[in-house]
Swiss-Prot record:
Residues 1-18 form the signal peptide. One of its GO terms (biological process) is proteolysis. Expressed by the venom gland. It comes from Crotalus durissus terrificus. Pfam families: Trypsin. Disulfide bonds join 31-165, 52-68, 102-260, 144-214, 176-193, 204-229. It is an enzyme of class 3 (hydrolase). This is Thrombin-like enzyme gyroxin B1.3. Residues 25-253 form the Peptidase S1 domain. The keyword Disulfide bond applies. Thrombin-like snake venom serine protease. Displays a specificity similar to trypsin. Releases only fibrinopeptide A in the conversion of fibrinogen to fibrin. Reversibly increases the permeability of the blood brain barrier (BBB) in mice. Induces the barrel rotation syndrome in mice, which is manifested by gyroxin-like, rapid rolling motions. This syndrome may be due to its effect on BBB permeability, and certainly also to other actions affecting endogenous substrates present in the endothelium, nervous tissues or blood.
């Protein structure tokens, strides 16, 4: 009887550990500290609350989602563990903010992209480096990497100190049109559809603005999804970086005639 009780207690402990482990992330793991040197963290200035992720694309510019915009934003570069006191040299402010079509009138299928010019350039280091813009459009079927400090539980919100990373699949745009009829997505759009149709892996609240990296290239910006996160047959939507390349590159080059593209 004693042996049976011991075995029963061990089984209970194993089941308890398995349940806790499955709740640690929405299908991902903690990112390696050397894996995300281009990932930036956006905070609301007055409340000091974490808002979104973003991507450093050169020493002076960051790409994120338009819906992450606030009147007063702090941007931190070279961050891994958010519980560690930030160095003042990691902190930047927006000098200029640009929105596609010059207006913050994004939708679930268009214009959810914001280009931020930092108040001063960053110095590259082991943990601070840019992610290159794509040289070609992404290929459906690609395995893509997502990362961020977004919630690791859904629908409850639990924000981790260290960013989490996961692999998802780039899907045909029609998959998202079928999966999200409530969004009334148009036949064509400047967005990407990505996720795991079996469920269990997904970006979620406050991962917004972070990168979707396919075959080593910065192809998407975390934009919209359904809640709770990581449901089967509910992939998420990502702003397509490649379709905004001309706009991005011309603004960075200082052209004033392309700030409001049609």
């Amino acid at each position: 009887m004693v042996l049976i009780r011991v075995l029963a207690n061990l089984l209970i402990l194993q089941l308890s550990y398995a349940q806790k482990s499955s709740e640690l992330v929405i299908g991902g793991d903690e990112c390696n500290i050397n894996e995300h040197n281009f990932l930036v963290a956006l905070y609301e200035y007055w409340s000091q609350s974490f808002l979104c992720g973003g991507t450093l694309i050169n020493g002076e510019w960051v790409l994120t989602a338009a819906h992450c915009d606030r009147k007063h934003i702090l941007i931190y570069v070279g961050v891994h563990d958010r519980s560690v006191q930030f160095d003042k040299e990691q902190r930047r402010f927006p000098k200029e903010k640009y929105f596609f079509n010059c207006r913050n009138n994004f939708t679930k299928w268009d214009k959810d992209i914001m280009l931020i010019r930092l108040n001063k350039p960053v110095s590259y280091s082991e943990h601070i480096a840019p992610l290159s813009l794509p040289s070609s459009p992404p290929i459906v079927g690609s395995v893509c990497r997502v990362m961020g400090w977004g919630t690791i539980k859904s629908p409850q919100e639990t924000l981790p100190d260290v960013p989490h990373c996961a692999n998802i699949n780039l899907l045909d745009y029609e998959v998202c049109r079928t999966a999200h009829p409530q969004f009334r997505l148009p036949a064509t759009s400047r967005i990407l559809c990505a996720g795991v149709l079996e469920g269990g892996i997904d970006t979620c609240h406050r991962d917004s603005g972070g990168p979707l990296i396919c075959n080593g290239e910065f192809q998407g910006i975390v934009s919209w999804g359904d809640g709770p996160c990581a449901q089967p047959d509910k992939p998420a939507l990502y702003s397509k970086v490649f379709d905004h390349l001309d706009w991005i590159q011309n603004i960075i080059a200082g052209s004033e005639t392309v700030n409001c593209p049609s």
